[in-house]
Amino acid sequence: MKRDKKEQVVQEVAEKIGRSQGIYLTEYQGLNVAKMAELRNEFRKAGIEYKVVKNTLVKQALLQLAQADKLADGLKSTTAVAFGYDDPIAPAKIIRKFSKTNEALKFKMAAIDGIVYGDDKLVMLSEMLSKTENIGRTAGLINNVVSSVPMVVNAVMRNLVSVLDQVAKQKQ
């Protein structure tokens, strides 16, 4: 690859890293072309970009963004990078699911919001709720609270009426 092409790739990778909410490094050695295409399709369906890039070029892109020290340990052997633009957790779910049936795919590490997660954290990351799921749960909790307030007020009023009715009966 010529120098100007390498510089272009470094710029593209740096731009993708800058836009990403989550960056995942995987080792794909041993995956055949069909399995790699299947994995890319899974990522594509979720709006995730998955690229095979030379380790040195990824490292140069990380240096431009002052993040090389965080992910440099994962840049060994064959590396492919998953860029999670909208949901930083979605790549972890796909990697975990795919690696259950394809042992050749290995999770190396991830960086989400500046925090680096090692290869032992894939299960934890994949079990986390996505941003959309968290918003949905929060909205559901708020809705439950709002809908239960009138019921509580009605119960208090019903109890008060019952007490007043019993007091009135005792006075008769």
Curated annotation (Swiss-Prot):
Protein name: Large ribosomal subunit protein uL10
Any one Pfam family match given in the protein's UniProt record, by short name: Ribosomal_L10
Binding partners and assembly: Part of the ribosomal stalk of the 50S ribosomal subunit. The N-terminus interacts with L11 and the large rRNA to form the base of the stalk. The C-terminus forms an elongated spine to which L12 dimers bind in a sequential fashion forming a multimeric L10(L12)X complex.
Matching InterPro entries: Ribosomal_uL10, Ribosomal_uL10-like_sf, Ribosomal_uL10_bac, Ribosomal_uL10_bac_type, Ribosomal_uL10_CS_bac
GO cellular component: large ribosomal subunit
Domain of life: Bacteria
Statement: the UniProt record of this protein carries the keyword Flavoprotein: no
Keyword terms, alphabetized: Ribonucleoprotein, Ribosomal protein, RNA-binding, rRNA-binding
This protein's record includes keyword Ribonucleoprotein: yes
Chain's gene name: rplJ
GO MF terms, alphabetically ordered: large ribosomal subunit rRNA binding; structural constituent of ribosome
Gene3D superfamilies according to UniProt: 3.30.70.1730, 6.10.250.290
Protein purpose: Forms part of the ribosomal stalk, playing a central role in the interaction of the ribosome with GTP-bound translation factors.
GO biological process: translation
Protein family membership: Belongs to the universal ribosomal protein uL10 family.
Recorded coiled-coil stretches: none
